[in-house]
């Protein structure tokens, strides 16, 4: 269940079902039941108007009640907005089916763990690490192909562990399923022409680049970063001011976009 929460409010304030709530990026939610404040707290159940992961939000993310309620601030915060998954894209599904067709389970080979992990909703990539926690142990690192945040939710990690465990040898007693650590990469760019549209296009290209090249034990090469920027629609020329050196990604990491500074 998802909620919007207010704290430090008067008791007896009521938000009715069907009220519209909006996030800063214009994603909308609707209250699914009536709720009344008590003990200075108002917590109302909500559902996102759009299907998939777009409705997920970190606890504390600002939300706005579109229709004001007398005595209640319009601004509240997200509370437990997790667990939304995008419908698997056709090409991703096709690739997974083909992979399963060509890769017959072999009783716990490295590729088996990857195939099993991808059978869990929200997981499109996985890596197997033998002897991760000692001789005989198997580590499985899981991730999605989300361009903004490929690190799965804790609930997805739990689901993967529960799914793989019975399939793995010895009922998965030596199995460790875990999520990657985000390796945040910041950029400093001078671009010509410099418009909001071109900045957005460059941002999109960099996200796609990090998904392709920012895999565990990979290396982000400065030349390929520049190549990605040059592929942005409308970009004529640019200067990559940072990073200036290639960036190595550790075996337990995935590269994710940090801050882009524009000059």
UniProtKB/Swiss-Prot annotation:
Entry-linked InterPro entries: Baseplate_J-like (IPR006949), Phage_Baseplate_Assmbl_Protein (IPR052399)
- One Pfam family per UniProt: Baseplate_J
**Remarks, anything else?**
Encoded by the e14 prophage.
- Give the UniProt family note: Belongs to the Mu gp47/PBSX XkdT family.
Name recorded for this polypeptide? Putative protein JayE
Lineage at the top is: Bacteria, Pseudomonadati, Pseudomonadota, Gammaproteobacteria, Enterobacterales
């Amino acid at each position: 269940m998802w909620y919007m929460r207010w704290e430090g409010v008067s008791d007896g304030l009521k938000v009715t079902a069907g009220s519209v709530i909006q996030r800063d990026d214009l994603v909308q939610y609707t209250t699914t039941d009536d709720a009344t404040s008590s003990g200075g707290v108002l917590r109302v159940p909500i559902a996102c108007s759009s299907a998939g992961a777009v409705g997920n939000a970190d606890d504390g993310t600002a939300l706005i009640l579109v229709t004001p309620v007398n005595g209640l601030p319009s601004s509240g915060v997200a509370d437990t907005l997790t667990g939304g998954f995008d419908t698997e894209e056709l090409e991703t599904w096709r690739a997974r089916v083909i992979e399963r067709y060509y890769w017959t389970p072999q009783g716990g080979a490295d590729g088996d763990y990857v195939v099993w992990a991808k059978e869990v909703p929200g997981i499109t990539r996985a890596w197997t690490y033998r002897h991760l926690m000692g001789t005989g142990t198997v580590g499985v690192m899981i991730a999605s192909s989300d361009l903004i945040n490929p690190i799965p939710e804790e609930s997805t990690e739990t689901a993967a562990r529960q799914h793989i465990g019975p399939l793995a040898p010895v009922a998965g007693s030596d199995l460790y399923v875990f999520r990657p650590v985000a390796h945040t990469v910041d950029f400093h760019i001078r671009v010509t022409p410099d418009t909001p549209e071109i900045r957005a296009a460059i941002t999109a290209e960099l996200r796609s680049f990090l998904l392709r090249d920012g895999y565990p034990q990979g290396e982000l090469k400065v030349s390929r970063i520049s190549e990605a920027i040059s592929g942005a629609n409308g970009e004529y020329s640019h200067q990559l001011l940072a990073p200036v050196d290639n960036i190595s990604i550790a075996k337990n990491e995935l590269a994710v976009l940090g801050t882009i500074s524009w000059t």
